[in-house]
Regions:
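Short hydrophobic/aromatic beta-strand micro-patches
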Residues: 9, 52-54
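An amphipathic, aromatic/His-enriched active-site/gating alpha helix that lines ligand/cofactor pockets
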Residues: 56-82
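Short S/T/G/P-rich N-terminal loop/turn motif that feeds into the first structured element of a domain
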Residues: 1-32, 36-38, 42-47, 81-83
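Functionally engaged cysteine thiol sites
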Residues: 29, 51, 65
Length: 83
């Protein structure tokens, strides 16, 4: 599996509580696709959400988002964890 960081750009800003609810929906859906949603970060004022995902591929990570709540990422990058 590969670590990915995805980026969501949400016009008009985003509330942390709404992202928390979406993350819970991801957790309920992730096993169907062999994906693990690990963490997320939110920039409420600028409408940015960043998710750290352990996934077989980028498409599987976005499929979870699509099925769980419909908010797919606009960008997704493979990343490596540093020491």
């Amino acid at each position: 599996m590969t670590l990915y960081m995805d980026v969501h750009n949400i016009d008009g800003g985003v509330a942390l509580k709404d992202v928390a609810q979406a993350h819970m929906a991801d957790l309920q859906t992730q096993d169907q696709y062999g994906v693990r949603y690990l963490r997320y970060w939110v920039d409420e004022a600028n409408g940015k959400v960043f998710c750290l995902i352990d996934s077989p591929d980028a498409d599987a990570a976005n499929r979870v988002h699509r099925e769980a709540h419909g908010l797919v990422a606009q960008e997704i990058y493979p990343v490596e964890e540093g020491d």
